[in-house]
UniProtKB/Swiss-Prot annotation:
Residues 39-107 bind DNA. It is found in: Nucleus. One of its GO terms (molecular function) is RNA polymerase II cis-regulatory region sequence-specific DNA binding. The gene is SOX2. Signal peptide: none annotated. The keyword DNA-binding applies. The 9aaTAD motif is a transactivation domain present in a large number of yeast and animal transcription factors. This is Transcription factor SOX-2. Residues 241-259 have a biased composition (Low complexity). Its main location: nucleus. GO terms for cellular component: cytoplasm; nucleoplasm; nucleus.
Length: 315
């Protein structure tokens, strides 16, 4: 058996390549491999076994690629038992000892293959300008999507916390989600402002009388309602929020804060100038807005007395 292996392991005679004027790189590489100065590594047990098996499989399947033959040989080698591998392991040890005896100064130095540049490496911009730009755009889109998702989650949490399941305050959430453009002309603002102020005040009064837990649960949300609506009611709603949080009896303080005396004209003008741009507020429209805001501030809450006390129906 060993004699058969030795006959198979004899290196073939070096083939002399015809020195044509082609100058092919493959022929140069083959000449370098077959040069007598280069010392090959000793074969391991798998290479000793696969040497004869590869030749046999190549003869049986002439159209099979060498890589596919290597895969099949590796799978077959794993299926072999230790007793079947033993003679090939011993032969590999003998070849290694012989190799060390013939070449005592041999040291394995793996040759680094010079890989050809890929297309993306050939045509990249100098300084890596293309990749950072794409990463910046991707990052910006990701941040925008994350912020939008965070706002939607916050709105949904407010709605479910207050007991309104995406229906009671749907329109107000849409108005809060899309900020209004500051460049609206004064004429449209003067026409649309009384109707918008009336709707917001009605919603706020109904929410106070029906459910006090809405004001107690999310004061910031009600504050945003008042800021989205009339500027004249913003101070009253802010005061009611502060008093509702600090006092021990929220219903009494909230109703009394809405039925308090109207503010002075100068304070209301300062408050309007604080919430609206100065150039867009015409002076003739100011008395009408002051009158409307005073009217809604002095309007009594349904279900309360004139002095702001609770009705006696519970006694």
């Amino acid at each position: 058996m060993y004699n058969m292996m030795e006959t198979e392991l004899k290196p073939p005679a070096p083939q002399q390549t015809s020195g044509g004027g082609t100058g092919n790189s493959n022929s140069a590489a083959n000449n370098q491999k077959n040069s007598p100065d280069r010392v090959k590594r000793p074969m391991n047990a798998f290479m000793v076994w696969s040497r004869g098996q590869r030749r046999k499989m190549a003869q049986e399947n002439p159209k099979m690629h060498n890589s596919e033959i290597s895969k099949r040989l590796g799978a077959e080698w794993k299926l072999l038992s230790e007793a079947e591998k033993r003679p090939f392991i011993d032969e590999a040890k003998r070849l290694r000892a012989l190799h060390m005896k013939e070449h005592p100064d041999y040291k394995y130095r793996p040759r680094r293959k010079t890989k050809t540049l890929m297309k993306k490496d050939k045509y990249t911009l100098p300084g890596g300008l293309l990749a950072p730009g794409t990463n910046t755009m991707t990052t910006g889109v990701g941040v925008g999507a994350t912020l939008g998702a965070g706002v939607n989650q916050r709105m949904d949490s407010y709605a479910h916390m207050n007991g309104w399941t995406n229906g009671g305050y749907g329109m107000m959430q849409e108005q809060l989600g899309y900020p209004q453009h500051p460049g609206l002309n004064a004429h449209n603002a003067a026409q649309m402002q009384p109707m918008h102020r009336y709707d917001v005040s009605a919603l706020q009064y109904n929410s106070m009388t029906s459910s006090q837990t809405y004001m107690n649960g999310s004061p910031t949300y009600s504050m945003s309602y008042s800021q989205q609506g009339t500027p004249g009611m913003a101070l009253g709603s802010m005061g009611s929020v502060v008093k509702t949080e600090s006092s021990s009896s929220p219903p009494v303080v909230t109703s009394s804060s809405h039925s308090r005396a109207p503010c002075q004209a100068g304070d209301l003008r300062d408050m309007i100038s604080m919430y609206l741009p100065g150039a867009e507020v015409p002076e003739p429209a100011a008395p009408s807005r002051l009158h409307m805001s005073q009217h809604y501030q002095s309007a009594p809450v349904p279900g309360t007395a004139i002095n702001g006390t609770l009705p006696l129906s519970h006694m």
